[in-house]
């Protein structure tokens, strides 16, 4: 007798052709996908596919929430209002007309472009505090651009310095955020370690950076002067 063949109805294995992500927007399918992620039955490709589908499904709601929180922060957040005032004094203008909430396809929180303004990745915002940190981060970029005429494209030292500044001043390296969200459990020199680590990651992502060692070297070259610079604040605010 021929050897028995596996049943066509048996549970499929995760492979290059089956990444473990089930298509569908219904609640049952979504919970099955979440369970597959939690139990390790979904590949990295499948997890990304699940996240993209979720982001597309929630795009309108994510952008609306982001815009509402953006407008609230522009009106009521002390750090955002302070940065807005200092940017305005340098001849710039950042407000709801050029701070955009959009769905992003790459995993980042936001970005700054001198010609267009600030992008906030609505699908990556965890809560209003995260959005406030991201806005402050990018507004420090805008302040640096107006005050120091930063060469974003070619000068890695300029890029490294502004990354150190904005990461240190925006609040994203607060102890609680590092401890509870990122699993960084240092009690001494935590702020400095966080700023340097995240600045190196940002510089590493730039096209003119060769590798991580190159990024680390550039950040170390500008570290002493740039970490001490707290403009437009008198001291590290958050």
Swiss-Prot record:
GO biological process entries: mitochondrial protein processing; mitochondrial proton-transporting ATP synthase complex assembly
A cellular component annotation (GO) from this entry: mitochondrial inner membrane
Broad class of where this protein is predominantly found: mitochondrion
Residues that, per the record, bind a divalent metal cation: 137, 141
Membrane topology: Peripheral membrane protein
EC number of this enzyme: 3.4.24.-
Keywords recorded for this protein, A-Z: Hydrolase, Membrane, Metal-binding, Metalloprotease, Mitochondrion, Mitochondrion inner membrane, Protease
InterPro entries (alphabetical): Peptidase_M76_ATP23
Localization per Swiss-Prot or TrEMBL: Mitochondrion inner membrane
Domain of life: Eukaryota
Gene Ontology MF annotations: metal ion binding; metalloendopeptidase activity
One family name in Pfam for this protein: Peptidase_M76
Active-site residue numbers: 138
PROSITE patterns assigned to the protein according to its UniProt record, in alphabetical order: ZINC_PROTEASE
Family membership: Belongs to the peptidase M76 family.
Known function: Has a dual role in the assembly of mitochondrial ATPase. Acts as a protease that removes N-terminal residues of mitochondrial ATPase CF(0) subunit 6 at the intermembrane space side. Also involved in the correct assembly of the membrane-embedded ATPase CF(0) particle, probably mediating association of subunit 6 with the subunit 9 ring.
Protein name: Mitochondrial inner membrane protease atp23
């Amino acid at each position: 007798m021929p050897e028995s063949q596996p049943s066509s109805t048996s549970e499929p294995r995760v492979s290059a052709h089956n990444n473990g992500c089930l298509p569908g927007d219904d609640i049952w399918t979504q919970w099955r996908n979440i369970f597959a992620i939690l139990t390790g039955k979904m590949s990295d490709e499948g997890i990304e596919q699940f996240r993209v589908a979720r982001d597309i499904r929630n795009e309108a709601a994510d952008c609306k929430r982001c815009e509402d929180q953006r407008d609230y922060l522009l009106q009521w957040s002390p750090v955002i209002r302070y940065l807005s005032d200092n940017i305005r004094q340098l001849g710039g203008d950042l407000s709801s007309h050029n701070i955009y909430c959009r769905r992003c396809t790459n995993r980042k929180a936001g970005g700054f472009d001198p010609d267009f303004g600030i992008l906030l990745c609505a699908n990556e915002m965890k809560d209003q505090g995260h959005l406030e940190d991201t806005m402050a981060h990018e507004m420090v970029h805008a302040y640096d651009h107006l005050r120091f005429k930063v060469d974003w494209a070619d000068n890695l030292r300029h890029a490294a310095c502004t990354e150190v500044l904005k990461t240190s001043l925006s609040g994203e390296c607060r102890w609680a955020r590092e401890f509870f969200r990122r699993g960084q459990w240092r009690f001494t020199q935590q702020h400095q370690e966080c700023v340097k680590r995240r600045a190196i990651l940002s510089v590493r992502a730039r096209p003119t950076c060769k590798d991580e060692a190159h990024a680390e070297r550039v950040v170390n070259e500008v570290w002493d002067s740039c970490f001490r610079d707290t403009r437009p604040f008198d001291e590290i605010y958050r």
